[in-house]
Amino acid sequence: MGFMFLAESFDEWAKPKVKNGYNRFFATDAEKDVVNLVHATRNHPSIVMWSSGNEVPDQWGAEGVKRAKWLQEIFHREDPTRPVTVGMDQVKATMESGFGAIMDIPGLNYRLPLYDEAFKKFP
């Protein structure tokens, strides 16, 4: 039996979900944490892709797009062989901001009625 794994890094970036969350460390530690994750797991045969976040509040607006690009570039620099995704629960917002379009593989969580529209916007 084989398993395929998506190695996920963060539950929040710069915008907080909770008062004492990772957002307090994002600016100083995110790059180091991505590098450590990739270096620790990149040679495992079950890792098929990377995720730079799950339902992060940064999905809204231009700053979130910049952060998504920055994180994806770090993953690509450290491992150019695997794609990067983000689990996006704000599908409409990611279509409008361009957030989803920059992902190697857009990760759509929920919002099933928007999938056809998202498929057209996220080639």
Regions found by a protein language model. Give the residues of each.
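Active-site mouth of glycoside hydrolases
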Residues: 1-116, 123
